[in-house]
Amino acid sequence: MAWASSFDAFFKNFKRESKIISEYDITLIMTYIEENKLQKAVSVIEKVLRDIESAPLHIAVTGETGAGKSTFINTLRGVGHEEKGAAPTGAIETTMKRTPYPHPKLPNVTIWDLPGIGTTNFTPQNYLTEMKFGEYDFFIIISATRFKENDAQLAKAIAQMGMNFYFVRTKIDSDLDNEQKFKPKSFNKEEVLKNIKDYCSNHLQESLDSEPPVFLVSNVDISKYDFPKLETKLLQDLPAHKRHVFSLSLQSLTEATINYKRDSLKQKVFLEAMKAGALATIPLGGMISDILENLDETFNLYRSYFGLDDASLENIAQDLNMSVDDFKVHLRFPHLFAEHNDESLEDKLFKYIKHISSVTGGPVAAVTYYRMAYYLQNLFLDTAANDAIALLNSKALFEKKVGPYISEPPEYWEA
């Protein structure tokens, strides 16, 4: 069937680190479609979607006191140091227990602050047992300034237990500032960064059989240095069904991160559309009530995922010393369906569906409707993602001095 080839072709557009469905499930769904076993194909798609939506993600962050653990955790969660629920920074570590910090927007994601092994009396193996190592998807070991032997021993113990760990060297900005201050004539930024990375790698290799990657991260601007590479590596190593929630949990600080989110959501929308298309004979009225109700919710979710929700826009406008209304003039999504009349998106869809139903009948109208809903969700998604990318260089965006965006209605509105 043509569906099978289109299904396979769609997912070939995405790299491994972006793909939210396993190759096994892709092959299984294609096989069922080719054999015209649509109900079985739908069952697999439904299971994939359930796994994607309900997948828990537990990230363990450990390191010695003063290494910048709390700053790293707060940044991962998109929480300011003074906001409610932030991991305390600048404090002396006194707890011997792990502390969970849930993601503020994604309850399935929890980042665990583990006490540095040097502050406990445990051996590396006992430390991991005490910290319930089997509950985490991966470990991030945070280190700053001088390399600690405890870091290497912990990395070795994690590797021996078959767990993934990632070594993150923080406070890179401080290192560069100090080097430039004391060696202004010979200062070479790239050379300093290479020396720091080599120093950490060499010490890790002394304890490990392999050469684990070292990621240099700024505590001031996390989008700099190796953080984008760390994101990519984590996405590559995670199981396919957990990549979706992890990509959505990341802040939209780089174009690569925004595109990971876009790719992940596009695949989810496609899977939902394939499922809907296979069940296109269900009563049309039920579809309208189910999906029309969700259109506004879907659009608002996309805004939230890309940092374009009302609260985020208020903060950005305040930072730029602008009113929110003046700020929104430069974005597309607030004006996506703006018209000269006040007809809502739902009203337009409902009118269109009534027309199609009267002309073609239920099943054909159902397929047409789902095709349109798929288009709309992708339109929402691309608009939000493109606005988020534009905001990465807000100065250039505002210098264009464009007027309000008024989107023309899609061609299929008019019968």
UniProtKB/Swiss-Prot annotation:
GO biological process, one term: innate immune response
Up-regulation conditions: In macrophages, up-regulated by IFNG, but not by IL2, IL4, IL10, nor TNF. Up-regulated by IFNG in lymph node cells and thymocytes and other cell types. In astrocytes, up-regulated by TNF and IFNG; when both cytokines are combined, the effect is synergistic. Due to sequence similarity with Tgtp1, it is impossible to assign unambiguously experimental data published in the literature to Tgtp1 or Tgtp2 gene.
Binding residues annotated for GDP, in chain numbering: G66, G68, K69, S70, G90, K171, D173, N219
Modification(s) after translation: (Microbial infection) Phosphorylated by Toxoplasma gondii ROP17; the phosphorylation leads to disassembly of IRGB6 (TGTP1/TGTP2) polymers into monomers and dimers. Phosphorylated by Toxoplasma gondii ROP18.
EC number: 3.6.5.-
Sequence ranges assigned to domain IRG-type G in this UniProt record: 55-237
Modification (Microbial infection) Phosphothreonine occurs at: T89
Annotated TM spans: none
Pfam families: IIGP
Official protein name in the record: T-cell-specific guanine nucleotide triphosphate-binding protein 2
Gene that specifies this protein: Tgtp2
